[in-house]
Amino acid sequence: MSSKKGLLYFRDGELLAQSGEARVYRFMDFLHLDIGPGHNLWAIESELEDYVWQINDRPKGDCLEIGLGLGVASKYILSCPKVKTLTTVEINKDVIEVQKQANPINDKRHLVLNADGLIYMYATDRKFDFVFVDCYALIDEETLPMIADYSRACEKVLNPDGEAVGWFDKATPEEFVGEFYNLWEIK
């Protein structure tokens, strides 16, 4: 009999890809991305339902995504019928590598750049019709100022009728929900 107490994706799952400190495991029919020696869970393929709810049918035209993760949101955005292109900016080259190995996106409309998303938005002259920002792990008093920086940068890269959405963590404490949503009311 096993002495294991519960199942863990990194112990009981199959390692599919590794680059640097980024790893992708398949566990219970879903991909799991973790980063670092402490197995910091960064993304789970089952988040698709959350992305569908949050992003909905907003993606259209030229789209920008900040944060790649497993590419789940990328695939959803690219599945939207009005999307012409998707540029995804990911700061961690190891995340880009393991995503390519474990969950590749074979769509000529998709471009992945290894860069800091905030710097990219301030440096680029490109304009986008939709921006999705998903590069933070939680929403609280420490991350809200950074999220506000991304929201302001979206104003620079959005076309006049464009929309921006920030990833919403369902576990966000109630005291931060209103402030978070107010950041994404971009005019």
Model-based region annotation:
Residues 1-62, 71:
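Class I S-adenosylmethionine
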Residues 61, 84, 129:
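Conserved acidic residues
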Residues 65-66:
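Class I SAM-dependent methyltransferase core
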Residues 70-82:
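Conserved SAM-binding loop of SAM-dependent methyltransferases across substrates and taxa
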Residues 85-90:
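Conserved SAM-binding motif I beta-strand of class I
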Residues 92-125, 130:
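S-adenosyl-L-methionine
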Residues 124, 137-187:
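C-terminal substrate-binding/active-site "lid" region of AdoMet-derived donor-dependent transferases
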Residues 132-134:
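A conserved beta-strand element that flanks and buttresses the S-adenosyl-L-methionine
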